[in-house]
């Protein structure tokens, strides 16, 4: 019986010890930062996968699917190519004297006049597209001794045979075709674009029927250039009932220069000139519909927003557009390192600081305090450190956009077959530029993300050190982002620590006294586990002894009989 009483006393003594830190003479103050249940993964210089509370996508990966007609003037080519509109194909007459910022060519565009080719098609197309106008001025060329305004059934204008409206097909008059020698000076202060051509008959009979001479010749000159073309007579694939063809050429006459045309046959003469303008107009092949909306950036896929620094919708763009990169996604960290809060905090609901985990539910700030004292628990944000971090992060996105947005258009590149090697080289250069920009973009974002995370970590450390300097010897760093305060610290006291008005001298004596007392209790209570295990072992031993003694006593009295057989 004495043993049982002694063991009961030991158990009661062990569990009657006060839990350190749970009395009214101490308090706990923890510092922490905002956290979310599911963060966003970003890349930094040192880590390919680091979780942050918030991030902004930097790559625009989709278009609106339509081309906006504002603020750029969009001219829909419909079923006409730009060159057909330039030459005056009958079904493209609606484009005469039109202007544009962006001419949109459709995949269903077709020619509906006499068969032609342009030896330097891409250059002429680009030249006219960048001029942004089809403004045409008719001039009084004098063509003596020939028949003008030739036409063809392949180029009907209404029910009658016709021809390109900007060109004049000259044929023999009677049985003669004299040598033509015409000059046209440029007395204006702008460049003039003259379009002319050479007819290639399908047979020698057609050649003499139209031009008398068995072989014609066309020479067009300025002070800066000269082109001489000899017709190539021969049958070609039939197009709209014709096996002949026309080659289209062009000449630019500078102010003060003179255009000279010399020919003895096969001349497709100009009727005037196109007024050349300088600007940033362009052309784009696209089947996206044109709609009434606003967008600064246009791609063949449709307009895209330019509020992001990068895009991977299309390499071809017009306007102020994000830079094209290969990556589908690049995320810019706009929040701090995310460490989700641990849900289980022990039997007594202990709180922990930023070293263990972040705090979810902090909607009024990025950094803050949690406390546990005689009045309960509480939480408050630290607005000063929060604002310091936000001020430095804000503007990151705009700065990246300013560094990368193109203020010009990336035109389509076209080359003739004979320029295949140049095309291959140009493609290699463009691909290299894209690779370089893609690498630079990833590096730039990784650097910015590293800076953001280091910055937010630094603000947390600054707040922790500021609190440590206030508390001094009145509290002990618990190693998890918390301080154990060794004096009674009510809510007013906690608030003074948060706002920086805490006076450690007021509580110094109380803190020192409590520190020594609590340390002593903690030292004694450190043997509690040993006492419990020893008590348990002794109890088990005594129970076994009592049970064995009972069995032996019963056997002696005859109450229990034990037979052993061999």
UniProtKB/Swiss-Prot annotation:
Cystine bridges: 30-482, 68-293, 80-92, 113-155, 297-321, 489-493
Membrane recorded as keyword: yes
Cleavage, annotated site positions: 345-346
Alphabetically ordered keywords of this record: Clathrin- and caveolin-independent endocytosis of virus by host, Clathrin-mediated endocytosis of virus by host, Disulfide bond, Fusion of virus membrane with host endosomal membrane, Fusion of virus membrane with host membrane, Glycoprotein, Hemagglutinin, Host cell membrane, Host membrane, Host-virus interaction, Lipoprotein, Membrane, Palmitate, Signal, Transmembrane, Transmembrane helix, Viral attachment to host cell, Viral envelope protein, Viral penetration into host cytoplasm, Virion, Virus endocytosis by host, Virus entry into host cell
Membrane-traversing stretches: 531-551
Similarity comment: family membership: Belongs to the influenza viruses hemagglutinin family.
Protein name in the entry: Hemagglutinin
Organism, as annotated: Influenza A virus (strain A/Duck/Hokkaido/8/1980 H3N8)
